[in-house]
């Protein structure tokens, strides 16, 4: 083989090597481009998913607002209902109290009349007409007390009882060995109460 032929062969081999290198380089670049495209596509998908997670559905937001409004309205309703029930109970109690004590003023005004009748009954006389009159007054007195009792009027027990400032008014002190200290020895004026409410305390004499 001549030097010329060897030179041609050598150039041909060099050309083939260059083509192989170029092909390898092109393949690497294509792989890199493919990888880059894949990464970009993955990033885009990830960004889209993140954006979808972050975004709030307007319908869900509207439902939340409606739920909050419903809760507020329920609280207002429960508050108003409780206030109304308390008002009803208060009015009912006031009506019951008024019904129970509606005769208080009338009964209080009648007490002096009862006192006068009882004083009249203490007067003594031998005349038959007087006794007949006194008997009539006695009947009126008993009838009146019976009617008042039916309307809730009660006498306050005093004589022989321990003094109680809630029901008795001490006007005189006594020194009676037959009674304990603080006991009522004599009732000077009757006291009355309407159920559990005192209309007038008893005026009494209290032992020292």
UniProtKB/Swiss-Prot annotation:
GO terms for molecular function: adenyl-nucleotide exchange factor activity; protein homodimerization activity; protein-folding chaperone binding; unfolded protein binding. The keyword Cell membrane does not apply. The keyword Chaperone applies. GO terms for biological process: protein folding. Keywords: Chaperone, Cytoplasm, Stress response. GO terms for cellular component: cytoplasm. Pfam families: GrpE. It is found in: Cytoplasm. PROSITE patterns: GRPE (PS01071). Residues 46-55 have a biased composition (Acidic residues). CDD domains: GrpE (cd00446). SUPFAM superfamilies: Coiled-coil domain of nucleotide exchange factor GrpE, Head domain of nucleotide exchange factor GrpE. Residues 1-62 are annotated as: Disordered. It comes from the Bacteria. Belongs to the GrpE family. Homodimer. Participates actively in the response to hyperosmotic and heat shock by preventing the aggregation of stress-denatured proteins, in association with DnaK and GrpE. It is the nucleotide exchange factor for DnaK and may function as a thermosensor. Unfolded proteins bind initially to DnaJ; upon interaction with the DnaJ-bound protein, DnaK hydrolyzes its bound ATP, resulting in the formation of a stable complex. GrpE releases ADP from DnaK; ATP binding to DnaK triggers the release of the substrate protein, thus completing the reaction cycle. PANTHER family: GRPE PROTEIN, GRPE PROTEIN HOMOLOG, MITOCHONDRIAL. This is Protein GrpE. It comes from Staphylococcus haemolyticus (strain JCSC1435).
């Amino acid at each position: 083989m001549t030097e010329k032929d060897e030179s041609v062969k050598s150039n041909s081999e060099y050309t083939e090597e260059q083509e192989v290198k170029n092909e390898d380089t092109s393949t690497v670049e294509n792989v890199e481009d493919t990888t880059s495209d894949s990464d970009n596509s993955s990033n885009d998908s990830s960004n889209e998913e993140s954006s979808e997670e972050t975004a709030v559905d307007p319908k869900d937001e509207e439902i939340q607002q409606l739920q909050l409004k419903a809760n507020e309205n329920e609280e207002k309703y429960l508050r108003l209902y409780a206030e109304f029930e308390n008002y009803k109970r208060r009015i009912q109690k006031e009506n019951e109290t008024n019904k129970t004590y509606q005769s208080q003023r009338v009964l209080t005004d009648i007490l002096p009349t009862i006192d006068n009748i009882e004083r009249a009954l203490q007067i003594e006389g031998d005349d038959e007409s007087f006794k007949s009159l006194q008997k009539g007054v006695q009947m009126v007195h008993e009838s009146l007390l019976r009617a008042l009792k039916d309307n809730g009027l009660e006498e306050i027990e005093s004589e022989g009882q321990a003094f109680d400032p809630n029901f008795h008014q001490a006007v005189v002190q006594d020194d009676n060995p037959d009674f304990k200290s603080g006991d009522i020895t004599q009732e000077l004026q009757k006291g009355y109460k309407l159920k559990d409410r005192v209309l007038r305390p008893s005026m009494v004499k209290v032992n020292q």
